[in-house]
């Protein structure tokens, strides 16, 4: 019992000790951690606590986080003794001023965050003591001025952010002490760019040249250079004027204690700063109170002393330059004086063998002693020729060449020693350094004779021919280097040429001979002949030629030029080798020999025999196609699940969603092509395994893989055959007037030309490694012309990406935007449906392989993105056209792989209406029967936005933090790519509905289909007119428009299809016109409150239109802001190469690298082949490119990347070509674009200028179209625009009221007819009777000839009244030619025969009492029924008679068609619903 109390006592004692320990710990924590703050080790976080002052923290604190409080000021010493502090976060407070000593004792602070406060001023010594500071963030404050000494105490500062403040001016030298600077941001300030800011421009240029630092600063004022980078500003633009001296000082003698004045006045812009020099050293007025600089620049020296004696000079200096006065001397009269020069030696020229004297004398007390040395301070040689005169001069007799050089005169006494230097320039006889060589050239060429010489003085080069003066004409030119250039050499130019080097000493001469050979047109030395070969063999077609100059040999197959590839090889002499011949290679081959004199051609026919034998792959067909269907479908389904079941997770997902086809037919066609090619790949692998050979080697022939009958079987099972379209162009009433949505039947002879979902055309034959489907560069080790191809990403970072842009002084950003909008009317490549490789289903971005369909863009080892762990960028190949890549459309041969254009090639507003009937129906408002397009939400302006797309989560809902607004729905699925493009789609959707409503008012008898198609026709014509009359002339320039030529009418032999190189490389030049910022401007052309949008934030962001002001601010930012100038050294801004589709924690894409990779994927031949195609000179060395790419820096980069000119990819080469004056294109790019746009125009039967498409009155009105008018009519509230919105104009003087912009008068589309109630209805009772007349002959000028009218009258007389009972009709027969009687008689006989058949049919039907209508339904005699709401039919005596109800004019302005009613009615509440 005694033990228990003891235990209780012990227990109580332990409890007391525990409580005491806890109290001690708590007290220690309380002392170091402020109330309500979170403290962990040396980190203190006091966020969102409404603090108004800096709390006290422990001295060992390394991170102090005071964000999101209400701190208004920082007291000096607030952080005293926090010497361990490394990071200080004070952003998002209310600090207004940074006082001196605010950060005392923070010598180890590295990171200081002060952004998003209300800071207005910073004291001069505010950051003193921050010797370790590396990063300082002051952006988003209210700073207006900066003291130049504010940052001089920060030797280690690497990053300084000052953007989004109110800084207008910067004092020179503000950042000059920041030697460690790597990133400086001054953008989004109100910088006034005048002469005072040129020091900053020089600093930014220094940063850019060194490459060690990045900086951003843009001008806000004056308006004419608003948005320009400060680095691009020049003194000339700002009218800066160098100083000029207006009053000079004079020599002065003074005694001790007096005052002396040296006068100096200067003028300049800006006002020059006056600086005084004494003995070439700047005087400091601060260190000597006796020195004063007066307001007018005069130097006043008070209480003169002996130390003031010397040579004075005034220097006037400003940002544009400097000027100096003459030197004046201040002599101090008194005790011992230092030496001063009375006469200084001067530079002297002397002839060899003559004598020379350099004078030198000085004064001082005591009298100075004169001595001489050479310039390097070595004593003069002991030479009897060299003497010093009694006055101190240096005298040299019989001067030799070795006497040339620098000499120094020293004047010394007991007080001081001074010296002066001069040169003796010994003049010598000329000596040649470059001598001309004899040349043999061909008549008409240009020849250079190089000649250069040296001597003293520099000799002059003079040329003679045979001792006589050269002809005085433009052909003979002596360049400044001394080279003689003879242009267009003629036979009489042959002879001896003398180069003479002449100076005052004498002359030298050297001769060279010119031999001129006459020009000779190409003559064939060997020619090919018709040949028949077996499939799978290699064949060589001989062709060689002779001529002067030596001809170049090219080959064409069926009109398309052949290029070097795995399939074709052209030897140096011109022989064409075709590897692995298949039936696809059969055809006509033409060998063309060209030189500057002319050309010659010869052709042959190659026939290919296909022996009926089994092939190695036949046994594997069945199993391979089953496996191919399974693997392809599995990969596609996996991709669809990944993309459509959740939000986009990465830029890869965004790109895939953006490009993924939505039309079921497109998906089916792409799937079939993938299955077909995958099947043959599997067969190839089986054969390779069975034969144990390398099928990738050149010895294996693909045409031996599978026999033709099995290729047809694979085509059927894969779905290729099922997806062949059968075109029906029989409805000529429609096709003669309107376009189909898919582009078919435009060319009636070739209905598929230019249609959607067809293969791109080719200017040159495709280039694949294996000749069929393997891209160049897929094997990174394979050499081309002795060099491996560079990675596309390396080309992008080395050659294309740029952070510096130059504003276009002529054209607005709308020039770029129209180009992109137009491009989306012309082409869209169908990419692979799967993001995973077919072999094992792994995602392409994770495996970084080239297994189909993957073709990853590899990242070079030294790329900045390697740090994030990325090895590649996502990329999948484009889907092949069914039957290409492995087989022909006949499914019996191997054809090179071709790609699918998802759009119609014609300029037909397919981006507004869609390229298939399925797409067109999805965007039409079919319910209203008014011919309108569907509309979305209506804004405050009363105008609607585009409708929202429906379906699974889309690319527009990529970020949960942004507004969950889905994508807009338009005719092209890329409408949401960026906000500027979305605004253009909105404009044209509104334009359709505006025109449709107007046409329906003018023609209330038209049904919805008529209104829709007439409006679509007008909108397409407007886009054509804007493109060819307003946009193309600015892109092509005068030279390019001449290449395009005038419109001469429709040519059915021209294929208007888009050629592959245009879509894949050439028209992507527009990427170089894109600004990194989308500007948003209000009605006063000032930034809207939400600000501008960086490009990487403008992708897939429709919520910014819905929630942030609509389309008007974006449109003003397009036509009210200068575009990006296309400069070969400033191509794609880094928003496109480094932040494309960027998302958090992911690797963004690179548009330039994607463009290059896509070109290789599509088998686009190298740049050199297109040069030859465009009749530019062949370029076999990089020096040969100097005429088109003048920059030696760019040529050196190309050589470093590609090694050979024959390897250069087309896209980067087109981008770096120098612009043809007056255009925005280089010569090769101009050739390609003018070719494509000429084909688009001339090969379009329904081109708006083609006679008969529109009436003359309608065409006149259409030519009033302008994009300015479209903006005025369809924006929310834009009231002022330029007449030409593509050209830069100054607001408001260069802008016009919308009332002054010409408009299209739609009244010329009003029907003038007696039968209007049915004339405009597609499905009306009389459509088949009156259709063709109303479509073709609505206007007086369009009426046919007399005989044609008689034939039509006959057709009406005998055909119309019988067509109720017959199915045959003759309205579509072509009329006989006026002079062709035989043809006329034959046609009449045919009409009579058909009429007899109709009569017989009518008689048989009249014999019965029942009637059978057009749908095959029987009706009893004397019965009536409604065929449609407006038509009542009656069966009487076996004859059907129908009556159409006539509609009375409606009593309201906007009648509505109600389902089931014939005529439009007025709703009772129509007036009440009006706003």
From Swiss-Prot:
Tell me which PROSITE patterns the record gives.
IG_LIKE, LRR, PEROXIDASE_3, VWFC_1, VWFC_2
Q: Where are the transmembrane segments?
A: none
Judging by the UniProt lineage, the source's domain of life is Eukaryota
Question: Where are the annotated glycans?
Answer: 387, 637, 696, 716, 728, 961, 1175, 1277, 1364
Q: Does the keyword Acetylation apply?
A: no
How does this protein assemble?
Answer: Homotrimer; disulfide-linked. The homotrimer form is predominant. Homooligomer; disulfide-linked. Oligomerization occurs intracellularly before C-terminal proteolytic cleavage. Interacts with PXDNL; this interaction inhibits the peroxidase activity of PXDN.
Q: Which family does it belong to?
A: Belongs to the peroxidase family. XPO subfamily.
Protein's name in the database: Peroxidasin homolog
What organism does this protein naturally occur in? Mus musculus
Gene that specifies this protein:
Pxdn
């Amino acid at each position: 019992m005694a033990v228990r109390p003891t235990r209780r006592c012990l227990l109580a004692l332990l409890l007391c000790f525990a409580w005491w320990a806890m109290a001690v710990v708590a007290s220690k924590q309380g002392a170091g951690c402020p109330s309500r703050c979170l403290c962990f080790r040396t980190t203190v976080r006091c966020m969102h606590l409404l603090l108004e002052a800096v709390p006290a923290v422990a001295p060992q604190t390394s991170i102090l986080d005071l964000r999101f409080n209400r701190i208004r000021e920082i007291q000096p010493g607030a952080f005293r003794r926090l010497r361990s502090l490394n990071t200080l976060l004070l952003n998002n407070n209310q600090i207004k001023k940074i006082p001196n000593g605010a950060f005392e004792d923070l010598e180890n602070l590295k990171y200081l965050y002060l952004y998003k406060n209300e800071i207005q001023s910073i004291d001069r010594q505010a950051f003193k003591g921050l010797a370790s500071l590396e990063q300082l963030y002051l952006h988003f404050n209210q700073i207006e001025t900066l003291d130049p000494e504010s940052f001089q105490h920060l030797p280690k500062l690497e990053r300084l952010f000052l953007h989004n403040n109110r800084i207008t001016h910067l004092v020179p030298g503000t950042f000059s002490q920041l030697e460690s600077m790597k990133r400086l941001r001054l953008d989004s300030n109100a910088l006034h760019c005048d002469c005072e800011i040129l020091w900053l421009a020089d600093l930014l240029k220094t940063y850019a040249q060194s490459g060690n630092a990045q900086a951003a600063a843009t001008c806000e004022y004056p308006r004419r250079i608003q948005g320009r980078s400060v680095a691009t500003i020049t003194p000339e633009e700002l009218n800066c004027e160098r100083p000029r001296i207006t009053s000079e000082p004079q020599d002065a003698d003074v005694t001790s204690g007096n005052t002396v004045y040296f006068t100096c006045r200067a003028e300049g812009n800006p006002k020059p700063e006056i600086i005084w020099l004494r003995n070439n050293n700047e005087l400091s007025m601060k260190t000597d109170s006796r020195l004063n600089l007066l307001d007018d620049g005069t130097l006043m020296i008070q209480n003169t002393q002996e130390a003031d004696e010397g040579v004075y000079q005034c220097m006037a200096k400003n940002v544009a330059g400097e000027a100096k006065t003459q030197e004046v001397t201040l002599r101090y009269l008194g005790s011992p004086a230092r030496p001063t020069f009375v006469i200084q030696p001067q530079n002297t020229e002397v002839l060899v063998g003559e004598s020379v004297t350099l004078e030198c004398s000085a004064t001082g007390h005591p009298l100075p002693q004169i001595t001489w040395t050479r310039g390097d301070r070595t004593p003069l040689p002991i030479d009897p020729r060299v003497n010093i005169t009694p006055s101190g001069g240096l005298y040299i007799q019989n001067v030799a060449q070795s006497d040339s050089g620098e000499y120094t005169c020293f004047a010394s006494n007991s007080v001081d020693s001074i010296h002066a230097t001069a040169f003796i320039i010994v003049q010598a006889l000329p000596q040649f350094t470059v001598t001309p060589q004899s040349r043999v050239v061909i008549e008409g060429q240009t020849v250079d004779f190089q000649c250069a010489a040296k001597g003293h003085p520099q000799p002059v080069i003079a040329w003679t021919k045979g001792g006589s003066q050269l002809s005085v004409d433009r052909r003979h030119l002596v360049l400044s280097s001394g080279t003689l250039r003879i242009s267009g050499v003629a036979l009489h130019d042959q002879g001896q040429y003398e180069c003479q080097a002449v100076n005052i000493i004498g002359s030298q001469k050297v001769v060279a001979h010119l031999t001129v050979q006459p020009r000779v047109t190409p003559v064939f030395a060997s020619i090919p002949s018709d040949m028949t070969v077996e499939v799978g063999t290699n064949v060589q077609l001989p062709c060689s030629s002779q001529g002067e100059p030596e001809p170049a040999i090219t080959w064409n197959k069926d009109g398309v030029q052949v290029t070097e590839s795995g399939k074709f090889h052209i030897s140096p002499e011109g022989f064409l080798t075709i590897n692995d011949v298949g039936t696809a290679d059969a055809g006509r081959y033409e060998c063309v020999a060209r030189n500057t004199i002319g050309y010659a051609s010869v052709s042959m026919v190659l026939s290919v025999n296909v022996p009926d034998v089994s092939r190695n792959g036949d046994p594997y067909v069945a199993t391979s196609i089953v496996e191919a269907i399974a693997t392809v479908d599995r990969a596609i389904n996996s991709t669809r699940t990944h993309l459509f079941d959740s939000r986009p997770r990465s830029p890869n997902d965004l790109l895939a969603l953006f490009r993924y086809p939505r039309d079921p037919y497109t998906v089916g066609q792409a799937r079939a092509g993938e299955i077909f090619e995958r099947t043959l790949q599997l067969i190839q692998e089986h054969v390779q395994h069975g034969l144990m050979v390398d099928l990738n080697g050149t010895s294996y022939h693909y045409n031996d893989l599978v026999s033709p009958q099995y290729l047809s079987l694979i085509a059927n099972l894969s779905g290729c055959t099922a997806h062949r379209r059968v075109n029906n162009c029989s409805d000529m009433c429609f096709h003669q007037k309107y376009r189909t949505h898919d582009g078919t039947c435009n060319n009636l002879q070739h209905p598929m030309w230019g249609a959607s979902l067809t293969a791109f055309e080719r200017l040159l034959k495709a280039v694949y490694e294996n000749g069929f489907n393997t891209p160049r560069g897929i094997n990174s080790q394979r050499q081309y012309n002795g060099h491996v191809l560079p990675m596309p990403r390396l080309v992008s970072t080395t050659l294309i990406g740029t952070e510096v842009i130059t504003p276009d002084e002529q054209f607005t950003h709308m020039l770029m935007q129209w180009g992109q909008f137009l491009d989306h009317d012309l082409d869209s490549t169908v990419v692979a449906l799967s993001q995973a490789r077919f072999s094992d289903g792994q995602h392409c971005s994770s495996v970084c392989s080239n297994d189909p369909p993957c073709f990853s863009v590899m990242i070079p080892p030294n790329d900045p993105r390697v740090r994030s762990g990325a090895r590649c960028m996502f990329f999948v190949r484009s889907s092949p056209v069914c039957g290409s890549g492995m087989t022909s459309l006949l499914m019996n041969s191997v054809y090179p792989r071709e790609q699918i254009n998802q759009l119609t090639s014609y300029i037909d507003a397919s981006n507004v209406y869609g390229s298939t009937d399925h797409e067109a129906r999805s965007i039409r408002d079919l319910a209203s029967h008014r011919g309108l397009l569907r509309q979305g939400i209506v804004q405050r302006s009363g105008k609607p936005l585009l409708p929202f797309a429906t379906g699974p989560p889309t690319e527009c809902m990529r970020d949960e933090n942004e507004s969950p607004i889905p994508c807009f729905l338009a005719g092209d699925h890329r409408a949401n790519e960026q906000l500027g493009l979305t605004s253009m789609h909105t404009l044209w959707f509104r334009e359709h509905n505006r025109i449709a409503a107007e046409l329906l008012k003018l023609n209330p008898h038209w049904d919805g289909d008529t209104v829709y198609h007439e409006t679509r026709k007008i909108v397409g014509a407007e886009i054509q007119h804007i493109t060819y009359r307003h946009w193309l002339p600015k892109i092509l320039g005068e030279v390019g428009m001449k290449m395009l030529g005038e419109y001469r009418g429709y040519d059915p032999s021209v294929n208007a299809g888009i050629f592959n190189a245009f879509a894949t490389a050439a028209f992507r030049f527009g990427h170089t016109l894109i600004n990194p910022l989308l500007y948003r401007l209000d009605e006063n052309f000032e930034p809207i409150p939400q600000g501008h949008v960086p490009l990487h934030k403008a992708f897939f962001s429709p919520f910014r239109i819905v929630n942030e002001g609509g389309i008007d601010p974006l449109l003003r930012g397009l036509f009210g802001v200068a575009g990006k100038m296309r400069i070969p050294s400033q191509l794609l801004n880094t928003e496109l190469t480094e932040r494309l589709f960027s998302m958090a924690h992911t690797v963004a894409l690179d548009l330039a690298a994607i463009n290059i990779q896509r070109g290789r994927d599509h088998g686009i031949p190298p740049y050199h082949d297109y040069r030859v195609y465009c009749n530019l000179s062949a370029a076999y060395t990089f020096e040969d490119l100097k005429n088109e790419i003048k920059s030696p820096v760019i040529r050196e980069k190309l050589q470093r990347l590609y090694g050979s000119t024959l390897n250069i990819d087309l896209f980067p080469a087109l981008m770096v070509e120098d612009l043809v004056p007056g255009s925005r294109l280089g010569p090769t790019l101009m050739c390609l674009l003018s070719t494509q746009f000429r084909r688009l125009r001339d090969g379009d039967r329904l081109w708006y200028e083609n006679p008969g498409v529109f009436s003359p009155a309608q065409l006149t009105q259409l030519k009033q179209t302008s994009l300015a008018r479209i903006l005025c009519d369809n924006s929310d509230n834009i009231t002022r625009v330029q007449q030409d919105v593509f050209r830069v104009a100054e607001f408001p003087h260069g802008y016009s009221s919308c009332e002054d912009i010409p408009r299209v008068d739609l009244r010329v589309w009003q029907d003038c007819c007696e039968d209007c109630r049915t004339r405009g209805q597609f499905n009306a009772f009389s459509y088949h009777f009156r259709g063709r007349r109303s479509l073709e002959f609505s206007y007086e000028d369009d009426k046919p000839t007399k005989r044609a009218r008689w034939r039509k009258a006959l057709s009406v007389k005998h055909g119309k009244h019988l067509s109720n009972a017959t199915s045959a009709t003759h309205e579509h027969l072509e009329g006989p030619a006026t002079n062709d009687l035989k043809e006329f008689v034959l046609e009449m006989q045919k009409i009579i025969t058909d009429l007899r058949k109709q009569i017989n049919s009518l008689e048989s039907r009249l014999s019965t009492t029942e009637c059978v209508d057009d749908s095959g339904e029987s009706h009893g005699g004397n019965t009536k029924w409604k065929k449609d709401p407006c038509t009542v039919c009656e069966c009487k005596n076996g004859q059907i008679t129908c009556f159409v109800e006539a509609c009375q004019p409606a009593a309201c302005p906007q009648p509505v068609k109600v389902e089931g009613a014939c005529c439009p009615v007025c709703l009772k509440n129509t007036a009440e619903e009006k706003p």
